[in-house]
A protein has these predicted regions:
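ATP/NTP phosphate-donor binding region
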Residues: 1-58, 68, 102-105
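Catalytic core of DAGKc-family lipid kinases
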Residues: 6, 37, 52, 73-113
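Short glycine/serine/threonine-rich phosphate/pyrophosphate-binding segments
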Residues: 43, 65-70, 90-91
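Short aromatic-hydrophobic micro-motifs that form the base-stacking/packing surface
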Residues: 59-61, 81
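Glycine-rich Rossmann-fold phosphate-binding loop(s) that bind the pyrophosphate
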Residues: 62-63, 85
Length: 113
């Protein structure tokens, strides 16, 4: 399974170590293409490109705003998962997604991929 992992490296709780842990968790079940956002709106562009390139799923590691951007780029029926990397992470709390991004990655691996 080919999965685009869209990462906002500027999000409050996204770090190199955290990204490495998330990658290790998702690599157990998928072939990852890690895409780093570089500017506002870039997540939507990256997700749209990944969908067009044949990604089987998209996973977003960012804050709530970055996830919203990513949703705007989603095309077709490609499933999407969210790993919380923001400071407040209101959306994950509302949806029952684990606050810890590695635990969330484990959940995504089981339920989405």
């Amino acid at each position: 399974m080919k999965v685009a992992l869209v990462v906002n490296p500027f999000a409050t709780r996204v770090s190199e170590e955290g990204l490495a842990d998330v990658r290790a968790e998702l690599n157990r079940v998928a072939q990852l293409d890690v895409l780093l956002t570089e500017h506002p709106g870039h997540a939507a562009e990256l997700v749209a490109g990944a969908c067009r390139a044949g990604a089987d799923a998209v996973v977003v590691f960012s804050g709530d705003g970055g996830f919203n951007e990513a949703l705007n780029g989603l095309e077709g029926d490609v499933p999407i998962g969210f790993l919380p990397g923001g400071g407040t992470s209101v959306l994950p709390r509302a949806l029952g997604i684990p606050h810890d991004p590695v635990a969330a990655a484990s959940q995504v691996a089981v339920t989405t991929l």
